[in-house]
From Swiss-Prot:
GTP binds at residues 28-35, 71-75, 130-133. This is ADP-ribosylation factor-like protein 13A. Keywords: GTP-binding, Nucleotide-binding. PANTHER family: ADP-RIBOSYLATION FACTOR-LIKE PROTEIN 13A (PTHR46090:SF1), ADP-RIBOSYLATION FACTOR-LIKE PROTEIN 13B (PTHR46090). It comes from Rattus norvegicus. The gene is Arl13a. Pfam families: Arf. The keyword GTP-binding applies. GO terms for biological process: non-motile cilium assembly; receptor localization to non-motile cilium. The lineage of its organism: Eukaryota, Metazoa, Chordata, Craniata, Vertebrata. SUPFAM superfamilies: P-loop containing nucleoside triphosphate hydrolases.
Length: 395
């Protein structure tokens, strides 16, 4: 029994001597599921409890590694503190909400900036496509295509792996195994380059560096060189964030201007359509098209003889006296009704219509008081036929 206990104790000491201390930071946008991921790590992997109250720091024991996991917030203020932990981390876990397609462009910008940072370039990165349980979640192949991971990996010389996962508490453990598989891959990639990564690891620890609200606890001050480096990095990140905010604001203003112009065009078009449907008088339309309109006139037509034969007047050609005497000087006037309003104003005026000739003999015979002049008319019937006059319309 003593030998058995001695063998177990010696084996535990050898295992503790081989354990490697690894620091990993978990980052991503807000509401991507980072806190649920760390909770899943604690459920699936044995963890080591600390006496200090550090809710954002978790220590895991997996294989031959003692892993310190730091959960960093993903809001705008929390992202400003990310560069303070790049140099201390051996590897990174980047959590992506695969169901939020609207923010995939924002994820692309942040991940590109992260991988091109000198303190992160060359370090292994595990990308977890979280919330795969949702209906519209993107597949890992789609995420690789959207984020252009192949180009980023080739340019930054960083190892990268995309693993689908879901961090729901009620999900069975067998469906949460991709989380453990991804973490094992990350630790194996760190173990292959552990010595190289440790040389890049700066002497101050994470607890000493942190002075923000993300990680609690008081620590020592950083060295002047590391502080100046971080100050330059923070200034650059502030400039980049200011530039991105300005670009986003300009793009939003451009989109609003386009919507305003489209709305104005639609309203003007509706106004023109409404005007075309409204009833308008005909006169302005015709005057606009160049038509000439004549005013209406109430015209009367008078029928009359061109020449009135008086008593004792003879024929001009023969010279014989005319003894015929008209019984009365009646003029046959008839008034035509005024043209109606519906008459076509644009028709040409009709030519004067020639009326059939009237025989004076017939006129006198119809007159009862012309009996006294029958003899004269009978004697000069041939002459009177020549003296018949024509009637015209006079306007």
């Amino acid at each position: 029994m003593f030998r058995l206990l001695t063998a177990c104790w010696s084996r535990q000491k050898a295992t503790e001597g081989k354990q490697r201390n690894v620091t990993i930071i978990v980052i991503g946008l807000d509401n991507s599921g980072k806190s649920h991921l760390v909770a899943a790590f604690q459920r699936l992997i044995p963890s080591k409890m600390h006496s200090e109250m550090r809710p954002t720091q978790t220590t895991l024991l997996l294989d031959d590694y003692q892993v310190s996991v730091y959960d960093l917030t993903g809001d705008l203020k929390g992202r400003e503190k990310w560069p303070n932990y790049y140099a201390e981390a051996h590897g990174l876990v980047f959590v992506v909400d695969s169901s939020d397609i609207a923010r995939i462009q924002e994820v692309k910008i942040i991940l590109t900036r992260l991988m091109f940072d000198k303190r992160v370039s060359g370090k292994p990165i595990l990308i977890l496509a979280n919330k795969q349980d949702k209906k519209d979640a993107l597949l890992p192949c789609d995420i690789i295509e959207y984020l252009l991971l192949e180009r980023l990996v080739n340019e930054t010389k960083s190892m990268c792996r995309v693993e689908p996962c879901s961090t729901i508490r009620n999900l069975p453990k067998r469906h949460q195994q991709p989380i453990v598989i991804g973490l094992r891959w990350l630790l194996a990639a760190i173990g292959d380059r552990y010595d190289e990564l440790c040389t890049r690891h700066q002497t101050p620890s994470m607890s000493n560096i942190s002075s923000s609200k993300n990680i609690r606890g008081c620590g020592e001050r950083c060295s002047s060189d590391s502080l100046s480096t971080r100050g330059v990095g923070v200034v650059r990140n502030n400039h980049r964030q200011h530039f991105e905010k300005r670009q986003h604001l300009e793009h939003r203003q451009h989109v609003e201007q386009r919507h305003f112009e489209k709305r104005q065009h639609f309203e003007s078009r509706q106004h023109l359509i409404q005007r075309s449907l409204d009833a308008r008088p005909l006169k302005p339309i015709l005057q606009k098209d160049g038509f000439r309109i004549r005013p209406k006139k109430n015209m009367s037509v008078t029928f009359a003889l061109d020449v009135i034969m008086e008593e004792g007047e003879c024929s001009r050609k023969i010279g014989a006296p005319n003894i015929s005497k008209p019984c009365n000087s009646q003029c046959y006037d008839t008034k035509t009704p005024a043209p109606s309003a519906d008459a076509n104003l644009f028709k040409a005026r009709r030519p004067k219509k020639r009326i059939e000739t009237w025989d004076t003999e017939e006129m006198f015979l119809e007159d009862p008081r012309g009996e006294a002049f029958r003899s004269c008319v009978t004697g000069h019937s041939s002459r009177s036929s020549r003296n018949t006059q024509s009637l015209y319309f006079t306007g």
